[in-house]
């Protein structure tokens, strides 16, 4: 551990204690040695006693910087772990940091390009268009065609800083795991590992560029979503170049109203986009907070979304997709038994789970939701409450489903912000029912066969040879097994013969000894002893030598 990491660790502890976060820890996490350590830091006092626990955590993370801000944002989506009060406070964290020097950005860009910026771009603006904790965005125009572009570049030394904070978080999580013991609901190490994978993925701008290209290709003919063009030839792990867009931030409701945007159509398209990404393409944008979404300025009566920042993308297995769709349909049909079955069949909870107890727990949580109209029921909260319930039955956390839940909550919140009367169920139900219909029945079977047909037709000419080879191999195996059986039987015969001779020799030797002790003048003891010794020698020498067969 370096001096810098010790200094950083002390700063983190000091900040957490100054916000009195030790006061909100459960008794399990404050054994006598924790209290002793806390009392030894007597000069660090709680300066925010009047604030709630959630607000104090938010302020502490804001003070600790970008890595902790992003962790807080991620935790705000884990409502299966945190109370709504704490989650709502963390959701207010903003990833806003002062920009770094434009000259440093120029150096970083030129290091990736291995050439001066002016070799490829004109009008490079050293004043950033936007700045965040991991990267910064600058504007320019392409020298080759004069088109406006943005250059996204990582902050200097950001990787080392993030790795150092992640190591500290991981070590702290292990301590908390130890203090909470087996069976704790929070599972800090699991949370930090999910966060580590997410944030390290954001450090590779080449990967983000490839994600954006794939998402753009999925919606090339769409009138609902536009992904800016990515100039792949200028994309590297620390640099990404893409088309500049001029949309209206989705959070700027006043500007959207001023241009006469069709909010109902926009909200419905948002829901359709989510389900299309998940169920049609199996590739969904998992970071759809308002800062990454813009609305087109042209054709406000037929608006479309503009999506940015494809650093975090999610995918589901075919099994997960099917179980998820069935879950939603079962919920709105109030089939709680089927929901419980689906969680067990999918492997999300253990097959040893008490099905009746699990079904009853789901019913207790979900039934009150039907006291409100269908158009007021939140898909995201349905999924959230199901996960919370399953948590008590030791659910195996699926990171891809956590991403999905977060995205669904974003989309729902956004849709109802744009159009409060949005009936999410009526918008999504036809899509889910159509998708389920495509997964079962003759049509689905024909589609699956059609998908496999090229592979089968490629392998068909090899079938006769494969059948012949397998028959030949079968004969060899049969012959080999017969040989092994013969050897085994021969071994058993030899073993039985040897054992018989050894036992007989032992009996003769014992009898000879007893007779000799009674009357040494008789000839019978000598016959017994000599015969016994001879049989023992024959039996010993006739033992099978090789046990391999």
Swiss-Prot record:
<feature type="domain" description="Protein kinase">
    <location>
        <begin position="123"/>
        <end position="501"/>
    </location>
</feature>
<feature type="transmembrane region" description="Helical">
    <location>
        <begin position="498"/>
        <end position="518"/>
    </location>
</feature>
<dbReference type="GO" id="GO:0010795">
    <property type="term" value="P:regulation of ubiquinone biosynthetic process"/>
</dbReference>
<keyword id="KW-0418">Kinase</keyword>
<comment type="function">
    <text>Is probably a protein kinase regulator of UbiI activity which is involved in aerobic coenzyme Q (ubiquinone) biosynthesis.</text>
</comment>
<dbReference type="InterPro" id="IPR010232">
    <property type="entry name" value="UbiB"/>
</dbReference>
<dbReference type="GO" id="GO:0006744">
    <property type="term" value="P:ubiquinone biosynthetic process"/>
</dbReference>
<dbReference type="InterPro" id="IPR004147">
    <property type="entry name" value="ABC1_dom"/>
</dbReference>
<keyword id="KW-0808">Transferase</keyword>
<dbReference type="InterPro" id="IPR011009">
    <property type="entry name" value="Kinase-like_dom_sf"/>
</dbReference>
<comment type="similarity">
    <text>Belongs to the ABC1 family. UbiB subfamily.</text>
</comment>
<keyword id="KW-0472">Membrane</keyword>
<dbReference type="GO" id="GO:0005886">
    <property type="term" value="C:plasma membrane"/>
</dbReference>
<dbReference type="GO" id="GO:0005524">
    <property type="term" value="F:ATP binding"/>
</dbReference>
<dbReference type="GO" id="GO:0004672">
    <property type="term" value="F:protein kinase activity"/>
</dbReference>
<keyword id="KW-1133">Transmembrane helix</keyword>
<feature type="active site" description="Proton acceptor">
    <location>
        <position position="287"/>
    </location>
</feature>
<keyword id="KW-0812">Transmembrane</keyword>
<protein>
    <recommendedName>
        <fullName>Probable protein kinase UbiB</fullName>
        <ecNumber>2.7.-.-</ecNumber>
    </recommendedName>
</protein>
<keyword id="KW-0997">Cell inner membrane</keyword>
<dbReference type="Pfam" id="PF03109">
    <property type="entry name" value="ABC1"/>
</dbReference>
<dbReference type="InterPro" id="IPR050154">
    <property type="entry name" value="UbiB_kinase"/>
</dbReference>
<comment type="pathway">
    <text>Cofactor biosynthesis; ubiquinone biosynthesis [regulation].</text>
</comment>
<keyword id="KW-0067">ATP-binding</keyword>
<keyword id="KW-1003">Cell membrane</keyword>
<feature type="transmembrane region" description="Helical">
    <location>
        <begin position="520"/>
        <end position="540"/>
    </location>
</feature>
<keyword id="KW-0831">Ubiquinone biosynthesis</keyword>
<feature type="binding site">
    <location>
        <position position="152"/>
    </location>
    <ligand>
        <name>ATP</name>
    </ligand>
</feature>
<feature type="binding site">
    <location>
        <begin position="129"/>
        <end position="137"/>
    </location>
    <ligand>
        <name>ATP</name>
    </ligand>
</feature>
<dbReference type="InterPro" id="IPR045308">
    <property type="entry name" value="UbiB_bact"/>
</dbReference>
<keyword id="KW-0547">Nucleotide-binding</keyword>
């Amino acid at each position: 551990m370096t001096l810098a990491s010790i200094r950083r660790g002390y700063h983190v502890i000091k900040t957490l204690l100054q916000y009195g976060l030790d006061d909100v820890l459960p008794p399990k996490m404050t054994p006598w040695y924790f209290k002793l350590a806390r009392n030894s830091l007597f000069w660090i006092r709680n300066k925010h006693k009047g604030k709630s626990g959630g607000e104090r955590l938010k302020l502490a993370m804001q003070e600790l910087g970008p890595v902790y801000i992003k962790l807080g944002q991620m935790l705000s989506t884990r409502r299966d772990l945190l109370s709504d009060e704490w989650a709502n406070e963390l959701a207010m964290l903003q990833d806003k940091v002062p920009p770094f020097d434009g000259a440093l950005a120029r150096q970083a860009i030129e290091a990736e390009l291995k050439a001066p910026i002016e070799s490829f771009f004109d009008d490079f603006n050293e004043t950033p268009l936007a700045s965040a904790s991991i990267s910064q965005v600058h504007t320019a125009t392409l020298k080759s065609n004069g088109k406006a572009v943005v250059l996204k570049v990582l902050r200097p030394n950001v990787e080392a800083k993030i790795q150092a904070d992640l190591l500290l978080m991981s070590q702290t999580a292990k301590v908390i795991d130890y203090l909470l013991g087996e069976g704790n609901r929070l599972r800090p190490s699991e949370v930090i590992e999910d966060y580590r994978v997410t944030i390290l993925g954001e450090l590779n701008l080449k990967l983000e560029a490839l994600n954006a290209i794939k998402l753009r290709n999925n919606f090339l003919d769409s009138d609902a979503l536009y992904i800016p063009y990515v100039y792949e030839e200028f994309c590297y792990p620390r640099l990404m170049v893409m088309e500049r867009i001029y949309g209206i931030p989705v959070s700027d409701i006043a500007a959207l109203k001023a241009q006469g945007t069709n909010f109902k159509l926009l909200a419905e398209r948002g829901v359709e986009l989510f389900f299309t990404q998940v169920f049609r393409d199996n590739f969904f944008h998992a970071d759809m907070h308002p800062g990454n979404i813009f609305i087109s300025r042209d054709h406000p009566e037929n608006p479309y979304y503009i999506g940015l920042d494809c650093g975090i993308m999610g995918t589901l297995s075919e099994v997960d997709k099917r179980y998820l769709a069935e879950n939603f349909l079962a919920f709105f049909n109030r089939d709680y038994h089927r929901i419980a079955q689906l969680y067990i069949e999918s492997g999300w909870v253990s097959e040893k789970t008490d099905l009746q107890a699990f079904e009853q727990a789901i019913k207790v949580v979900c039934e009150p939701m039907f006291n409100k109209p269908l158009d007021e029921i939140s898909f995201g909260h349905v999924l959230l409450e199901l996960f919370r319930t399953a948590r008590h039955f030791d659910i195996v956390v699926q990171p891809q489903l956590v991403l999905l839940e977060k995205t669904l909550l974003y989309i729902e919140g956004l849709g109802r912000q744009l159009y409060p009367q949005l009936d999410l169920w009526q918008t999504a139900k036809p899509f889910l029912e159509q998708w389920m219909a495509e997964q079962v029945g003759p049509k689905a079977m024909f589609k699956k066969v059609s998908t496999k047909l090229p592979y089968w037709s490629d392998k068909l000419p090899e079938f006769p040879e494969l059948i012949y080879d397998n028959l030949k191999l079968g004969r060899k195996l049969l012959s080999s097994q017969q040989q092994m059986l013969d050897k085994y039987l021969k071994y058993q015969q030899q073993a039985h013969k040897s054992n018989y001779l050894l036992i007989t020799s032992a009996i003769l030797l014992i009898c000879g000894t007893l007779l000799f002790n009674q009357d040494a003048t008789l000839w019978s003891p000598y016959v017994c002893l000599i015969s016994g010794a001879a049989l023992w020698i024959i039996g010993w020498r006739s033992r099978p030598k090789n046990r391999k067969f």
